[in-house]
Each structure stands twice: as C-alpha cells, then as structure tokens.
C-alpha cells in the first residue's frame, strides 16, 4: 500500500553548502505542502515513501509503462508536458521529480547511479515491474544508468538531446552567462513576463538560445512555431516547468556538479532496445552526445534530426519524430 503524505520543504534542501553565491534565491517556505501539486495541464503529483526516501511522482494512462527522466532544470511537470501525446496512445506515463527538484529531497540520490536506483525504488512502491525509460537533456545520465543497472526492469530506452558524457567544459561564454543569470534568478522575471505578454517573442528567444541555426533558419522555425497553437503552447509550457526556481535550485546545482564529474557512463552495458534522438543544431547538449551514445550502445537506433535544436518537440520534423517514437515503443512494448 502506498504511503502518501504532505511533504514539507525544510532547510535540509537549502544549497548554502554547495555554493554560498547562490543564497540570494529564497528557499520555499517550510509550511508549503507539496501533496497534490498540479502541473500546468492539471496533472496531479503525489509523494510516496520509498526505501530511497520520499519521491514526488505522477502517473497517468493505462498500458505499458514509460518512466520519464526530466531535464535540467525540471520536475515531474516537465515529464507531464512531454508525455501528453504518448499517454493518449495507449501507454502509462510515470514521471518523477528527480532529487533536488520540487518535492523530492536531494538526499534521495545525488549521482546518476543513485538516481537510477531511486527510480527503481519508486517503481517498487508503485508495483510496476518493467518500463521503457525515457530521458531528455539533463535526464540522460540517470536514464542511461537506469537501463544499465536495472536491465531486468527495462523493456526499452529512448533518449532525446540527452547528455551522454562529461558536460559543462564545452559551454559557450553566452551559455555560461545565461546559465549563471538563470541560477541567480535574474532571467526568470523577464521570461515570465514574455510568456504572459509576448509568447511569440519568448518562442523566438528560446529557439535562438537552444540552437545554432543561422538567423534566417531560426526566424523561419520561430514563425512555424508561432503559427502552430500546439507548438506555441509547448514552448510556453516548457518554460513554466522551470518555475518556481527556488524549488528546483538544489537539483539544478547538483546536476551541474554531477555532469562535470562524469568519467564514463555505462552506455556499453545497456542491453535493451534503444532509440537515441538528437538535433544536429543543438547548442545546449551538442550533437556529439547523441553520436557518442549511439556508437556506445550496441544495436541502438540513431535518429539525427537535421536542423534540430534542443527543442525537438517543436522541430519542423516534430510529427515525423512522434511517429518514429510511437513505432519504436509499440514494436518493443511487452504484450
């Protein structure tokens, strides 16, 4: 039986021990309940006690289970956003807030291996035997670690623009500046204002920052996104999964620290069917991460999205990519 309760955020989730320069971001009030948090689309999260510690999660749909590992920063709400269309096609989506994000304390698991084991503990508590593990962006290390460490529980793996090796040393100066500004809470009010007043401008800025497209190509993609209500809503929704930053700061800082410590992820130990998707013009997690993963995982299917940025869900080929994902999932899903 699940043990559900109201989780209170305490000072134990503060990041002052990690880096005092980030103490200007206020911690969330300790009397804020996290039970029944809702994502932007109304998905409700719960907190379950596991052998690894308390974990915030959501579960929707029926059918073969897909476990989502969100990016950096993120939370269960990011998995809910990405999993909407898949859930509607006969799959159960289970998303969680990785340690340090929202309602999952950082002590549940700091390293990719620890987070993989914590995810397995979550599945135990939910009575789920096997899953397809899906990881995007900063969720890559935990995703690859889960598939390698828990092969008997993984019927397939899908990664998208995912980190597959050491990350952080190759960031461009502009990216480092934007990342520092984001961590210090300087960009959130600006982008929040853009999301509410000028969503088209927000889409243009996110596409510009998340890709290496030339100006003409970036403008063309922005126009396509603005003209498509579903894609425009996705961009706005994705931004909303970055807030409130005060409840994601611990996970963000831990992720950045862990990514720089990566020596070698257990890619060559992944035995399940694997689909690796990456955009050729991804400026956040560079294309070489996808190439490296595809080379290292035996039998992996590799989809190189020409002109794709870090936001493949709004790429020109978005419909084709969705069809490819579903085809892969249906081919390998347990009967």
Q: How should each PLM-predicted stretch be described?
A:
Residues 58-103:
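Conserved HGGG/HGGXW glycine-rich cap/lid loop of the alpha/beta-hydrolase fold
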Residues 99-113:
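Glycine-rich "HGGG/HGxG" loop immediately N-terminal to the catalytic nucleophile
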Residues 114-131:
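Conserved acidic catalytic loop of the alpha/beta-hydrolase fold
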